[in-house]
Amino acid sequence: MQTPYQTNEAGHLSIGGVDANELAQRFGTPLYAYDVGAMRQQMRDFRRVFEERHLKYAVSYASKAFATIAMYEVAAQEGMHIDVVSGGEIYTALRAKFPMADVSFNGNNKSVEELTMAIENGLGLSLIHISEPTRLRCI
């Protein structure tokens, strides 16, 4: 069975060509390390499937998985949209200067403050609870 995991000549896990043991020694543990090259390739692969078929599309990164300025910068560079689920993720997207027209605010239990933040910054909204239109009228 083939896996996306690579080992180096020392038999250690290699992340983007870097020895994971060396990363742990340098930065301590627990440590989150991502292979940005592999992530970029996956983003391109998703987009290519739609482009080859000449389909109108938007591929969104579900930022609840990992919401940082650096991650949003990579997503923007690769032509991705992002899906946010909290005011904190909206704030991070703003700090990353992510194009707000490419951000969708999803999720349940959105506060009036979060909805206001989303509207004021031009985000798309996914309303999934019956009370959300009522909350929108308060804004």
Predicted feature descriptions by range:
Residues M1-L125, S131:
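A charged N-terminal "starter" segment
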Residues I128-I139:
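Single conserved hydrophobic/aromatic residue that forms the stacking wall/gate
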